[in-house]
From Swiss-Prot:
Residues binding heme, per UniProt: 21
Transmembrane annotation, as ranges: 17-33
Protein name: Cytochrome b559 subunit beta
Role: This b-type cytochrome is tightly associated with the reaction center of photosystem II (PSII). PSII is a light-driven water:plastoquinone oxidoreductase that uses light energy to abstract electrons from H(2)O, generating O(2) and a proton gradient subsequently used for ATP formation. It consists of a core antenna complex that captures photons, and an electron transfer chain that converts photonic excitation into a charge separation.
Organism: Emiliania huxleyi
Topological type in the membrane: Single-pass membrane protein
């Protein structure tokens, strides 16, 4: 049982990072697109 250091803290951190970015990136993109559209229409 020497392989107890790596598979404990690695997947959780990666999953959390992926979840946050998967939710944040499209949201920011969508908000920016809507804002620019409203500014152009006005």
């Amino acid at each position: 049982m020497i392989n107890t250091n790596q598979p404990v803290a690695y997947p959780i951190f990666t999953f959390r990072w992926l979840t946050i970015h998967a939710l944040a990136v499209p949201t920011v993109f969508f908000l920016g697109a809507i804002t620019s559209m409203q500014f152009i229409q006005r």
